[in-house]
């Protein structure tokens, strides 16, 4: 029996699943969606015809992908990782022979929420016999599916005696300007150093405050560089997008690399690793400390190892299947 992980090709999924590069019974397959007017039409036609296996395969899928999934046997386990699009899920599920398919939703299902299509999503997933799980509590209730912890992979980092800056953030603006601007002003007033690498993207930088604009860069930061900057910092900043209750990767990185965390996600109080010594929640009515007090006067408290392990990819996969599918060394 093998475990096949079929994932949307992205930097973070590839980094996490690289944990298994030397594990022969865990195989990663990248799915790159072909998205154009023709493939959209062919998907619609194929699904209307009952989703017959093989129909329009040469147009819908890359040959390499088809070759890789053809090796999957009925007794193998398959995890669809972050393939949230329902049509893609149904097409892939009908192409593989596995009798044990799980789908992990790694993004908030905002489109399903907007379109009020949760019932159709649940019905189709059940029809295809797919086990469904998510990291987001709201989506877990909406889709009546299993709630799993956020998941990551830790790597060894060189010891740094003196951090270069207090607070580190990397990411897109995505409407985060107001809380970010407030924090920057408080950092400056209290001599708290920070390094923010903000991605311009489609955002109009002409409307943002000067303290935000000066942090905007034209190029993405690679994940190895992100890890290096995490290592150089004392605290990570986590600002979730509107509508997301599940954790981003920032809190997990903070825990794994023993950094403090500033976040606007009050749902983090429900996590077993939550400790107010380590985590300061923006705009939380129960938070009586200033961010300066939190940064300067409260020592970090390490998270118990058994708690931290719940968020590591190997035990996480074992927990998903209630079996040791990924624990081989």
In which residue ranges do the predicted regions lie?
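Catalytic core of nucleotide-activated saccharide and alditol-phosphate transferases
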Residues: 84-188
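Short, well-ordered beta-strand core segments
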Residues: 78, 101, 131-132, 236, ...
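Structural alpha-helical scaffold elements that stabilize or flank donor/cofactor-binding regions
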Residues: 71, 124-125, 228-229
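Catalytic donor nucleotide-activated moiety binding site of glycosyltransferases and closely related
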Residues: 184-220, 224, 266
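Catalytic binding pocket for nucleotide-activated donors in carbohydrate/polymer assembly enzymes
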Residues: 212-218, 223-323
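Short, polar loop motifs at secondary-structure junctions
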Residues: 10-12, 133-141, 198-204, 264-269
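N-terminal pre-catalytic "stem/leader" segment of glycosyltransferase-like enzymes
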Residues: 1-98, 102, 106-108, 329
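Active-site regions of enzymes building and remodeling cell-envelope glycoconjugates
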Residues: 23-30, 41-48, 129-131, 142-153, ...
């Amino acid at each position: 029996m093998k475990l096949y992980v079929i994932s949307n090709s992205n930097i973070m999924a590839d980094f996490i699943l690289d944990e298994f590069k030397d594990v022969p019974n865990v195989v990663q397959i990248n799915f790159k969606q072909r998205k154009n007017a023709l493939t959209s039409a062919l998907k619609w036609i194929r699904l209307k015809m009952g989703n017959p296996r093989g129909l329009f395969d040469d147009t819908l899928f890359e040959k390499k992908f088809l070759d890789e999934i053809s090796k999957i046997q009925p007794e193998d386990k398959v995890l669809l990782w972050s393939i949230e699009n329902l049509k893609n899920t149904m097409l892939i599920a009908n192409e593989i022979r596995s009798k044990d398919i799980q789908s992990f939703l790694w993004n908030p299902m905002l489109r399903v929420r907007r379109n009020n299509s949760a019932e159709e999503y649940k019905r189709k997933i059940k029809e295809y016999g797919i086990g469904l799980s998510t990291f987001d509590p709201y989506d877990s209730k909406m889709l009546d599916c299993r709630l799993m912890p956020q998941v990551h992979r830790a790597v060894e980092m060189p010891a740094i005696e003196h951090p270069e800056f207090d607070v580190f953030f990397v990411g897109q603006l995505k409407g985060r300007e107001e809380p970010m601007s407030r924090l920057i002003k408080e950092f400056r007033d209290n001599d708290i150093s920070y390094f923010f690498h903000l991605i311009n993207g489609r955002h109009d930088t002409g409307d943002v405050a000067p303290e935000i604009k000066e942090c905007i860069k034209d190029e993405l930061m690679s994940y190895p560089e992100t890890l290096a900057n995490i290592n150089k910092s004392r605290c990570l900043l986590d600002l979730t997008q509107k509508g997301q209750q599940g954790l981003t990767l920032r809190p997990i990185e903070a825990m794994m690399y023993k950094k403090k965390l500033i976040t606007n996600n009050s749902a983090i109080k429900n996590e077993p690793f939550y400790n107010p010594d380590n985590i300061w929640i923006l705009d939380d009515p129960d938070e009586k400390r200033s961010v300066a007090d939190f940064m300067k006067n409260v020592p970090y408290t390490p998270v118990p190892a058994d708690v931290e392990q719940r968020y590591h990819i190997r035990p996480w996969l074992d927990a998903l299947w209630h079996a040791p599918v990924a624990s081989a060394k």
